[in-house]
Amino acid sequence: MSENIRESISAKTLSKDQMETSYVSLKTWIEDSLDLFKNDLLPLLYPLFIHIYFDLIQQNKTDEAKEFFEKYRGDHYNKSEEIKQFESIYTVQHIHENNFAYTFKNSKYHLSMGRYAFDLLINFLEERNLTYILKILNQHLDIKVYVGPKSEERPQGIETSVVDAEIDLTTFLVSRECEDAILGDEQYRYDHLETYVLQLRKQREMKPKDSVYKPNASQIHAEIEKLKDLCKRVAVNKNNLPSICCYTIHNTYEGLTAAEISNDLKLMACGFKDSYVEVYSLTNESLKKLKSSSELAKSDIKTLNEEKFEEVGSSYKLVGHSGPVYGLKFFSSNKFLVSSSQDCTVCLWSLDLLCLLAVYKAHAFPVWCVDVAPNDYFFASGAGDRQAIVWSVMTSKPERLIISSLSDVTAVKFHPNSSYLFTGSSDHRVRMHDISTASVVRIFCGHTDTVTCMDVSHCGKFLASGSKDRTVLLWDIQSSKLLGKYVGHENTVFSVSFCFYGSVLASCGADNSVRLWDRTDHKGGCLGTYYTKNTPLLCVKFGYRNIISCTGPFIS
């Protein structure tokens, strides 16, 4: 902070009335100030409010602290998620046991303020002899004073360490095994797919980086189909916007809690408040289920391949959870589906057998989100216990426990090279973790409310995040710098998606709309807005051919 602030610490312990009077005096002055300065000054009140509350608790004035807290918490409705975490704190021990409260108390709170507004603030505090407020400013706030227009957006909030660890964002579209399968197959000889793969192989030789996890036959088949679709993709940009297909789910009776579309846009899964998952076919083909071993034993060996599956219709219910389903994700091979629930578990389902394969237990609170690594070997979950857990399909025990968030982990996303995991939290931050060490390698600060969704560009260089603050933020992963802020949604953003080989970014949310943005336009101009009649959209996804699919429940 500026040297203009002198360190003034009162020698005597202030009473609750004196603390409250100081807070109210400053609050009234800020609310009566000119609009030109009010936006700079208003953010001061929240950290002051919390630190006064903590000071009263440290003086063992529990009743007075709660009275002060309840009286003025309404002034900070935009911080409702954080306020909820503080309302259960009554003693000094609670502060030490609550990770978020302890960090808030012992870290600097960042703010930006214009020079003139800052000078007015200091003059007011000195004229009114508000030395207690000055003490809090000195000890707990870090105010960056700027002159002239605000040159860049500086995140507000508690201090986080600047992480600048070395990271490798090298990303390949498909595995080496998939490339080998295509180049070694006669049916692709002199085909456009062979030419495409030869270009990919040149990129791989320039930056060799092989995964230790080798794909199986079904994964290689899925990657070949992916390349076939990519070869037929539509070029999309601000002058050539993509087509959008919306799937509306009727008669949910407000019971739909999650929805997900597969990467190839052929399957859709919905999670419900009634604890079940329903899988839908988005093509003309029926869902198929592998016959039981007794039925297969009766089949003719010559026709076994054609008869080993039986059709079960266009949808199928999967029952296994004991609470509302909050997260869903398909494996890239479409052979498996992973789901998370309020029952604190993660379930792995087989889409060949259409049954539950495994239940993963380690979380102590509801599991809000899941994601599957592109290599189909790892998947991750985030929960209300502030943990993200990386799991392996080979074992039911956690591979990594990632404990870095100060609040609920509400979104998880793997990097395309499967080496890093991004977590979004109710503490408004996105963190990037190295899976091999579980350490934080990047922190992205910019949202002002809970992070709800993320997506990483297919080149592995850019991150998009959506939030309850109704914005979509675009980040450069290497430098962790904010590239663009896209404003337009009128309610929570539920899903974001990058196109393939283009600059278009799609988002959808609770305002019943899909919005398209230009990734290269960092000023945040919207390319197009498409409204549904009355359907909040839970998922939006670019397919391999750059056609968008989205889904949500019809609210009658």
Swiss-Prot record:
Keywords: Nucleus, Repeat, Transcription, Transcription regulation, WD repeat. WD repeats lie at residues 251-291, 320-359, 362-401, 404-443, 446-485, 488-527. GO terms for molecular function: RNA polymerase II general transcription initiation factor activity. It is found in: Nucleus. It comes from the Eukaryota. InterPro entries: G-protein_beta_WD-40_rep, TFIID_NTD2, TFIID_NTD2_sf, WD40/YVTN_repeat-like_dom_sf, WD40_repeat_CS, WD40_repeat_dom_sf, WD40_rpt. The keyword Transcription regulation applies. Pfam families: TFIID_NTD2, WD40. Coiled coil: none annotated. GO terms for biological process: transcription initiation at RNA polymerase II promoter. GO terms for cellular component: transcription factor TFIID complex. Component of the TFIID and SAGA complexes. TFIID is composed of TATA binding protein (TBP) and a number of TBP-associated factors (TAFs). TAFs are components of the transcription factor IID (TFIID) complex that are essential for mediating regulation of RNA polymerase transcription. Regulates the genes involved in ubiquitin-dependent proteolysis during the progression of M-phase of mitosis. Belongs to the WD repeat TAF5 family. This is Transcription initiation factor TFIID subunit 5. It comes from Encephalitozoon cuniculi (strain GB-M1). The lineage of its organism: Eukaryota, Fungi, Fungi incertae sedis, Microsporidia, Unikaryonidae.
